[in-house]
Curated annotation (Swiss-Prot):
It is a multi-pass membrane protein. Its main location: membrane. It is found in: Cell inner membrane. Residues 26-43, 86-141 are periplasmic. It comes from Neisseria gonorrhoeae (strain ATCC 700825 / FA 1090). Belongs to the DsbB family. The keyword DNA-binding does not apply. This is Disulfide bond formation protein B. GO terms for molecular function: electron transfer activity; protein-disulfide reductase activity.
Length: 162
């Protein structure tokens, strides 16, 4: 792993941890109620941070190792982009025309081991079709911008690595 690629992955790890902490702060400090799709995006942010940590721990060697690391980090980021795009589509529909966004995560994961530890991360019953804003921009737009920045950064760092 080249120094540039390693620095980029460290940056992505740090930004992902901050974004995850920010999503928890928005829920538990600011009182914003996340919906099922918001929680899915939160889990994609957490997965991006964990993938970056795994890449840093494994220290991939050479161009192919960097490629595998870039792909590994990109998977949850691309998933997050698709979830954010779907939520933006739901929010663009006329009131009452949006389909349900599914069962709450707390219901889906209730019987899983260690659920009590994980439950604060997936708690939320907000409406997916009702937009929340930060600085005048819908939260799924911020989420999509974050995920796009992750993908562009990791692939830029991989392409620049020699």
């Amino acid at each position: 792993m080249t120094p540039l690629f390693r620095k980029a992955v460290w940056l992505l790890f740090a930004v992902s941890v901050c974004a995850f902490a920010g999503s928890l702060a928005a829920q538990y400090v600011l009182g914003m109620e996340p919906c099922v799709l918001c929680i899915s995006q939160r889990l994609c942010v957490l997965a991006t941070a964990l993938c970056a940590a795994v890449v840093l721990a494994c220290k991939p060697k050479g161009r192919v190792g960097g490629l595998s690391g870039a792909v590994f980090i990109s998977i949850p980021a691309v998933t997050g982009i698709s979830v954010a795009a779907y939520q933006l589509w739901l929010q663009s529909l006329p009131p009452g025309a949006a389909p349900s966004c599914g069962a709450p995560w707390t219901f889906r994961l209730k019987g899983w081991p260690l659920f009590d530890w994980f439950e604060p991360v997936v708690r939320g019953f907000g409406n997916c079709a009702e937009p929340d804003y930060l600085l005048g921009v819908a939260l799924p737009v911020w989420s999509a911008a974050y995920f796009l920045a992750v993908v562009l950064t990791v692939w830029w760092a991989w392409a620049r690595a020699k």
